[in-house]
């Protein structure tokens, strides 16, 4: 799939899609916002040369001066959004900004062996076969995932980022897909930069490998918040623009509620481990990476059901089973 061309979106906002070094998603939408005294870049993609060249060409094609970028705001701590942050900061001399929860998560992001150990432990207690877990996993950290630095400045929910002429970007903390995830809302137009929180065609994966007990609960609460705000035009990090962000958020919320009900029904029939729920909930021809994502998403759903009192859990000597 070819990467779309950069384009002007109006209201001093520009979109530069940058290719990614894996099958899906094939690109990330970065956004450039004119901010009176310069430019703000929202997200930057992974650290590989095609992505960097796409950004450089995008600025040139749009008639923008990349040296005017004074701030890089990253929506969340995933490599397709933050991976090139060190290079952007070094080459453009800009500030690197994220939500305050990122400060405690950067070391975890950089700790590749620790991430692998946590996933292996989780897979073991929830019944995921070791051959499925290890299939297709790189032995070393990919080059496009360099270690990242701490942000220069930390944002909190409710902050307003001044972009000139009485206009600002409101910071909305929307954890779930990732703990430090933020959306930004333009005070003048109401446009929402949604990162991965709201996507046009898929629900972002809510993985149970985060430093929080109920990532799915946090995600659903974040969706409900945006629904209540009446979000309209939405600029996501992947895919096409969304006309009604609140309606899409509701669709995603209802999808998760249905999946929760389906999984609760499966567990009610017999005590079962998470991997058995995975194999009965997803199509059988997933590739290795998608099996791992399906597993982590399923554990998030089962733990949300358990924490909300809809199912129980027993430990059978190193193997966790869920029960209705």
Where are these regions (language model features)?
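C-terminal regulatory/interaction regions
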Residues: 262-324
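Short, contiguous alpha-helical
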Residues: 90, 174, 306
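Short Pro/Gly-enriched beta-strand edge/turn motifs at strand-loop
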Residues: 11-18, 138-145, 165-167
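Conserved beta-strand hairpin/beta-sheet module of binuclear metal-dependent hydrolase folds
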Residues: 4-62, 66, 183-194, 200
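Metallo-beta-lactamase
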Residues: 39, 46-48, 140-153, 160, ...
């Amino acid at each position: 799939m070819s990467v779309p061309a950069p384009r002007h979106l109006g209201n001093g906002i520009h979109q530069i899609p940058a290719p990614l070094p894996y099958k899906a998603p094939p690109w990330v939408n970065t956004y450039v916002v004119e901010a009176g005294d310069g430019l703000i870049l929202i997200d930057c993609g992974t650290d590989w040369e095609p992505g960097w060249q796409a950004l450089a060409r995008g600025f040139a094609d749009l008639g923008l001066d990349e040296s005017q970028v004074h701030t890089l705001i990253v929506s969340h701590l995933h490599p397709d959004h933050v991976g090139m942050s060190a290079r952007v900061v070094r080459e453009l001399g800009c500030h690197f900004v994220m939500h305050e929860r990122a400060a405690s998560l950067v070391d975890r992001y950089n700790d590749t062996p620790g991430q692998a150990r946590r996933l292996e432990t989780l897979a073991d207690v929830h019944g995921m076969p070791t051959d499925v877990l290890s299939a297709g996993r790189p032995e070393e950290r990919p080059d496009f995932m360099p270690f990242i630095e701490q942000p220069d400045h930390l944002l909190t929910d409710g902050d307003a980022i001044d972009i000139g002429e009485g206009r600002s970007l409101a910071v909305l903390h929307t954890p779930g897909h990732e703990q430090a995830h933020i959306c930004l809302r333009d005070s003048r137009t109401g446009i929402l930069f949604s990162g991965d929180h709201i996507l046009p065609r898929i629900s972002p994966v809510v993985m149970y490998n985060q430093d929080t007990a109920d990532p799915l609960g946090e995600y659903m609460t974040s969706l409900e918040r945006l629904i209540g705000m009446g979000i309209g035009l939405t600029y996501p990090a992947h895919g096409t623009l969304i006309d009604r962000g609140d309606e899409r958020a509701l669709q995603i919320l209802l999808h998760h509620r249905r999946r929760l009900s389906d999984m609760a029904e499966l567990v009610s029939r017999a005590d079962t481990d998470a991997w058995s729920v995975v194999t009965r909930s997803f199509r059988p021809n997933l590739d290795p990476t998608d099996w791992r994502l399906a597993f982590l998403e399923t554990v998030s759903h089962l733990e949300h059901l358990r924490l909300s009192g809809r199912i129980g859990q027993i430990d059978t000597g190193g193997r966790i089973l869920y029960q209705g």
